[in-house]
A protein has these predicted regions:
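Membrane-embedded helix bundles of polyisoprenyl
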Residues: 91-101, 105-190, 214-234, 239, ...
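Periplasmic/ER-lumenal interhelical loops and adjacent helix-loop junctions
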Residues: 13-16, 22-36, 40, 218-311, ...
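Membrane-interface coil-to-helix junctions
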Residues: 1-91, 113-134, 250-303, 333-336, ...
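Contiguous transmembrane helix-bundle modules in multi-pass membrane proteins
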Residues: 110, 129-135, 143, 147-153, ...
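Extracytoplasmic
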Residues: 251, 413-420, 427, 433-437, ...
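Active-site-proximal, structured, solvent-exposed surfaces of multi-pass membrane proteins
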Residues: 40, 623-735
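Hydrophobic alpha-helical membrane-insertion signals
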Residues: 1-55, 237-241, 489-492, 496-503, ...
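Hydrophobic alpha-helical membrane-interfacial segments at the cytosolic entry of transmembrane helices
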Residues: 204-234, 249-252, 329-332, 376-391, ...
Length: 740
């Protein structure tokens, strides 16, 4: 991305698919690090959109426990410790759940490791949603199982783990967690009905009511414990949706209830059998074959070749535990429904949970005859694939002209993409894709060898010799773990932060810091086609440098002065919103003449806005303020803000001023008072949605204090505290072995 790629560079991004991890999710962590260090809290941010309730960002997971690590640790230490903690939580959670379901130590440990390294955790690693939320789900299932087994002390653990899962993800992941809990309820309800039928009793609605009530209480308390984040995020989502700005709710709405049309669910079904061998679906360094199936590499559901095959084949059978069948059914079928429009194929997380349990249960309980049959069939399948693929590869060697034509076609198709400007990079990706078509390419050879190792291990487990059987046992475990490690290694990018800083300083960033400073604000005019490759500092990335912008890119957007991409180059309009500078790609010929050029490079052109108004402006009376909003010539008195903080500010007001206008989005929760006074007043929302303060006339200078204390966060915190009290009381009551 510009301006970090330099002219003549021969190295390109290993994984461009996670570019929003750089432009958004790593930036969120940097914001958390900065605000927790400076102010001890994450609240308001003036760095994007002209001001937004940053703490309520639905995609940032600011309520997750790993965010608190940034209070005490440096950025990368907090990042790595948080990931390690989530991996361990996921692994031990699945281990505990499988052990509670009667799975032996070795297969349970294998299941835990496969779950901790499953493809959904890996592909969304930079976003942290999937792992942050679903690392807790096995613990939710384990706690429910413990309560069902008679351990009443497990009662408070269920809502506690649900809350941790809610806080670790997005609103989408909250829904996925709720579905997982609902599947557990359905499993228990069916068991309850079967038990009642066995005793000759009826199990109608009345009989199921206590069970449903228990799960409902758990869910409500889990939501209550996380209400301090859940309520603000839900409010932000509803606000953005009301404005028609929430991408997932509005994209392609006129075309179909499916984002990619009615063919989408059919193609998704066709792609399901390919999940067991994901290397054929492309890689982040070449091409994404799943796009042909109206999907993408983000949505691979891989946790080892044999485990996926077992889940797809055996997971439906009655010999598998019902909870496996229900999780697999939910994970595979729900993405084919209109729910995929709102929850995407992240629903595959349910399939992964059920599939890992099905795999562990199969190898724990399958007899020698069953394993022999499976080993023979898999060996035959592997041999057929290897021989056939080798033959095709040899044929391809004799058709180099056709392969070159295919490569050129791929490059030309990608020329119109966001990164199409980087033609050498497109050529490299196409070359890699062509190379990966051959069976002996490392992309395909290593997974095939690991699959052969696993099949050999499965064959050895059928031996009557105990030593060979145990060897096969460990070959399977080692093979499937090696598979998920290989998948992860091909996705994750490793670098030395000291040699390659996350947001390196460039001549462009230095001039922006110097010219814009802490009081200015930037607007960005993007490249019309190759915006990701050509536009310097794509939205949100300037926040990493503490440079404020009027635009941003998130799933939710504030109801503020300017909507996204509205009038990005209108100097007069933007000047009223405190926009002092315009950034655009080098050589942009279409910048309006109102902007004054001050710096140019191959990567970036920088312009100043002569029409910019000060962010903090004073007015002698209301008439002057109204003239400011209705005309362009009204003079203002620039004011100084002393603190440099986001959530608590101090503005020096000279004598004779009675009104203050702040070129920042007004939002509920902003209050002000004259320093030394006790009473706080609400900030007024101006007609252009900026902030206005009526401080009254005074013949002496004063200090005005502002604070940001949103009501929705206060209400959510109160609900969380009340829920915590109920959970504690319920836990103490449940500890007396009273069933409720």
């Amino acid at each position: 991305m510009s301006p970090w790629h330099q002219a003549g560079a021969t190295e390109f991004a290993k994984n461009h698919i996670v570019s929003d991890g750089v432009s958004q999710y790593l930036v969120y962590r940097l914001i958390a690090q900065r605000d927790l260090d400076r102010e001890g809290t994450i609240g308001w941010s003036s760095l994007t959109y002209g001001g937004t309730a940053e703490y309520a960002n639905t995609m940032a997971s600011y309520g997750d426990w790993t965010m608190q690590l940034h209070r005490w640790l440096d950025f990368w230490t907090a990042w790595h410790v948080g990931i390690l903690g989530q991996v361990l939580i996921a692994a031990f959670g699945m281990l505990s759940f499988l052990r509670g379901r009667g799975i032996g130590w070795s297969w349970a440990a294998c299941g835990g490791l496969l779950y901790a390294a499953n493809s959904q955790f890996v592909t969304w690693l930079y976003h942290r949603w999937a792992m942050g939320s679903f690392c807790w789900v096995p613990w939710v299932l384990w706690a429910i199982d413990q309560y069902r087994a008679g351990n009443r002390r497990a009662w408070p653990l269920v809502p506690a783990f649900i809350a941790m899962a809610f806080l670790g993800g997005t609103l989408q992941h909250c829904a996925l967690v709720a579905i997982a809990v609902a599947v557990m309820w359905l499993d228990e309800a069916l068991t309850h009905r079967a038990d009642a039928a066995g005793r000759g009793m009826k199990s109608g609605i009345a009989g199921q009511a206590p069970l449903f009530t228990r799960y409902a209480i758990w869910g409500v308390l889990g939501a209550g414990l996380s209400a301090f984040m859940l309520i603000p995020c839900a409010d932000a989502f509803l606000t953005s949706n009301r404005l028609g700005l929430h991408t997932g709710m509005t994209a392609n709405a006129a075309d179909s209830i499916y984002r990619y049309g009615w063919l989408q669910p059919i193609l998704h079904v066709a792609a399901i059998p390919l999940q067991w061998f994901p290397s054929i679906l492309g890689r982040c360094g070449s091409l994404d074959v799943l796009k042909l199936f109206k999907s993408e590499l983000f949505y691979i559901a891989f946790f080892g070749s044999l485990p996926v095959i077992v889940a797809l084949v055996r997971g439906w059978r009655r010999s598998s535990p019902r909870i496996c069948r229900l999780m697999i059914l939910a994970g595979l079928m729900l993405p084919l429904t209109p729910l995929v429009r709102f929850l995407y194929q992240r629903l595959y997380l349910l399939f992964i949970i059920g599939g890992i349990f099905a795999f562990a249960h199969f190898l724990q309980h399958a007899g020698r005859e069953t394993r022999t049959r499976w080993a023979k069939r898999l060996a035959a399948l592997l041999a057929l694939i290897t021989v056939g693929w080798t033959a095709v590869s040899l044929v391809l060697l004799t058709h180099q002209a056709q392969l070159e034509s295919l490569k050129q076609r791929i490059v030309s198709m990608g020329a119109g993409s966001s990164f199409g400007y980087l033609s050498d990079w497109l050529d490299l990706r196409a070359t890699r894709f062509i190379g990966d078509l051959f069976v002996w390419s490392p992309q395909q050879l290593w997974p095939l060898l690991l699959l052969a190792l696993i099949v050999s291990g499965l064959w050895l487990t059928t031996s009557s010799a105990h030593g060979l059987s145990r060897l096969g046992h460990w070959l399977i475990i080692g093979g499937v773990i090696a598979e998920v490690i290989l998948f992860g290694a091909r996705w994750v990018v490793w670098s030395d932060p000291k040699k390659e800083p996350l947001f390196a300083e460039t001549p462009e960033s230095r001039i922006l810091k110097s010219a814009v400073g802490s009081d200015g604000r930037v607007t960005t005019v993007m490249h019309p086609t190759g915006h990701m490759a050509m536009t310097p500092f794509v939205p949100n990335t300037l926040a990493a440098y503490d440079i404020a912008t009027i635009h941003g890119y998130d799933s939710i957007v504030p109801d503020g002065m300017l909507l996204p991409n509205e009038s990005p180059d209108d100097a007069a309009k933007l000047g009223r919103f405190g926009v002092t500078h315009l950034v655009t790609y080098g050589g942009n010929p279409d910048v309006p003449s109102d902007w004054r050029p001050i710096w140019k490079s191959r990567m970036m052109d920088l312009y100043a806005n002569p029409l910019a108004c000060p962010r903090y402006a004073g007015f002698a009376d209301e008439t002057s303020l109204q003239r400011f909003f209705t005309s362009t010539g009204e003079a203002t008195v620039p004011l100084d803000e002393e603190s440099g903080l986001q959530n608590k500010r101090r503005i020096h007001i000279p004598a004779g001023l009675s009104w203050i206008r702040i070129a920042e989005n007004q939002a509920d929760g902003w209050q002000w008072r004259i320093s030394g006074q006790a009473h706080w007043n609400d900030v007024i929302r101006a007609q252009d949605k900026s902030m206005v303060l009526n401080v009254g006339h005074s013949n002496t200078s004063r200090i005005v204090e502002l604070r940001y204390q949103p009501c929705v966060r206060t209400v959510g915190t109160i609900i969380s505290a009340a829920s915590l009290l109920i959970v504690i009381v319920g836990g103490l009551w449940g500890g007396r072995n009273v069933e409720f």
